[in-house]
Amino acid sequence: MLLSILVALCLCVRLALGVRGAPCEAVRIPMCRHMPWNITRMPNHLHHSTQENAILAIEQYEELVDVNCSSVLRFFLCAMYAPICTLEFLHDPIKPCKSVCQRARDDCEPLMKMYNHSWPESLACDELPVYDRGVCISPEAIVTDLPEDVKWIDITPDMMVQERSFDADCKHLSPDRCKCKKVKPTLATYLSKNYSYVIHAKIKAVQRSGCNEVTTVVDVKEIFKSSSPIPRTQVPLITNSSCQCPHILPHQDVLIMCYERRSRMMLLENCLVEKWRDQLSRRSTQWEERLQEQQRTTQDKKQIASRTSRSNPPKPKGRSPASKPASPKKNIKARSAPKKSNPKKSTS
C-alpha cells in the first residue's frame, strides 16, 4: 500500500471518543533533522517516552551512519526513534517497512561483525509490516517537495506551519501583478468543476512560503463535502503559484470550494471563495445533490449503452452477399417436366 506523505502541519487534536490525542512535536533529534518529516510523537517504537531519551539511545549508531554503510540506515533509525506524526495514526505511529530494515541490516551487519557486533534485537526486522500488506513507510513511499531549508514555527497552540526565507529572486514578486479571475457561485460552475471539498471557514493567516507557494491558514467551521477527513480545527490551504488566486484576506468568513491533491487541501485559481452568507449552506447542499444526480444519470446511461452493445453485436462488414440457391419448387418442376420428342423423319 503506497503511503504518500506530505507533512506541512502538526495538529494536536482530541479524538471524538473523548480520548486525548497525543500531540505532535518538532523533531529535535540531531540525526533526524533532515528527514522528509519534521514532526514526531512520543513514545516511539522503542518505548522512549521523550526525545531526550531517544537522543541518548540513537547516539550509539552515529559512527555507523557516518561511514555510510547503507543508504537507508539513517531513514530506518529515524523512523524507529522519531516516528512521523500524522493525524490518522496518532495512537499507533507508522513503522518503517520490513524491506527497509532488511536493506539496512544486510548492508551494515557485515561491517558490524568485523567489530564483534551483531544487528541489535531491538531493531529486528521480523515484526515490521510488509510494504504491500500493511501501512509502513519507506524512502520511495514518501512524496515530498519540502526543501532542506524549511524550518517550523508555532503559529497557534494547535498547529505548526512551515516558514522559509525568501530567495533574492522572490523579492520582485508583488500581489499587484496578479489578476485573479472571479469564479461565480452558480449551479453550472459547481457541476462543471466537481470540487472535492466544500467548507465554511474563517481566514486566520495568509503567508508566502516561497516563490511559488502561498499558505492560507483557515479555521474550519462547517464541512459540507470532503474526499478525505477534514479536522474541525485550523488547517493550511496550499496555493502552488506565485499569485494567490482567489485573493482573500485574514479575518474573512468565507465559503471555500476547491480540490485536494496528495492529501493536501489546495486553494487554486479555478476554485471558488465567496463571502459567507447563511443561505450558502442550503445552496451548496442542493448543488451537491444535483451533482450526485447528474453523476448517477451519466453512469446509468453508460451501463445501458454497455448492455445494448453486448446484446446486439455489430454485423460483420466487408463480405459480399452470398448468391441465393435456386428455389426447390423450381427444381422439382424442372425435373418433372416431360421431354419433348423430336418428330419422326418421314420415309419415302
Curated annotation (Swiss-Prot):
Region span, Disordered: 289-348
Tissue: Expressed in the involuting mammary gland, ovarian corpus luteum and prostate. In ovaries, low levels found in granulosa cells. High levels in corpora lutea of pregnant animals.
GO molecular function, one term: Wnt-protein binding
Xref: InterPro entries: Frizzled/SFRP, Frizzled_dom, Frizzled_dom_sf, Netrin_domain, Netrin_module_non-TIMP, TIMP-like_OB-fold
Gene Ontology cellular component list: cell surface; cytoplasm; extracellular space; nucleus
Gene Ontology BP terms: bone morphogenesis; canonical Wnt signaling pathway; cell differentiation; decidualization; female pregnancy; mammary gland involution; negative regulation of canonical Wnt signaling pathway; negative regulation of cell population proliferation
Domain of life: Eukaryota
FZ domain span: 19-139
Cysteine disulfide links: 24-85, 32-78, 69-108, 97-136, 101-125
SMART domains (UniProt xref): C345C, FRI
Description of what induces expression: Up-regulated 48 hours after estrogen treatment mainly in the uterine endometrial stroma. Induced in ovarian granulosa cells after 12 hours treatment with chorionic gonadotrophin (CG). Further up-regulated in corpora lutea by the luteotrophic hormone PRL.
Comp. bias intervals (Basic residues): 330-348
Positions glycosylated per UniProt: 38, 68, 116, 194, 240
Domain called NTR: residue spans: 178-296
Job of this protein: Soluble frizzled-related proteins (sFRPS) function as modulators of Wnt signaling through direct interaction with Wnts. They have a role in regulating cell growth and differentiation in specific cell types. SFRP4 plays a role in bone morphogenesis. May also act as a regulator of adult uterine morphology and function. May also increase apoptosis during ovulation possibly through modulation of FZ1/FZ4/WNT4 signaling. Has phosphaturic effects by specifically inhibiting sodium-dependent phosphate uptake.
Family from the record: Belongs to the secreted frizzled-related protein (sFRP) family.
Protein name: Secreted frizzled-related protein 4
